[in-house]
Amino acid sequence: LKLKEKYKYKRKVFIKNLILNVFIGIHNFEKKKKQRVRFNIEVITNPYIKPNNKDLSTILNYEDLINKIKLLVKKQHYELIEDLAENMFEIIFQNRLVKKINIKIEKLDIIKNSESVGIEFSKSKI
């Protein structure tokens, strides 16, 4: 069901400060011990598809998304944050509603005297 296009409309699903223990990094010590990694994810979805509680294909389920990310980081060691982000993009874009994704991935506790270091990524459908 499409909403009437009287307004410019935007819908964003977000996950804020999800912290998971992840095998990530190029250094030998990073390959032996999981690190705390913080994820902040924003997903812009098609705002003109009306959410329907009887048809969950009309929404992006954030609980499902979190579970997929948890599974992704459990499966392997990531040498680079960039590789992890690309795999996250691939999973999130499987949902037909997704138009744009912003991901911020931060390694916590890795650099002395720093709360975190990381990278922000943005990808959108053309």
State where each predicted segment sits.
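N-terminal, polar/charged subdomain of small-to-medium soluble alpha/beta proteins
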Residues: 1-126
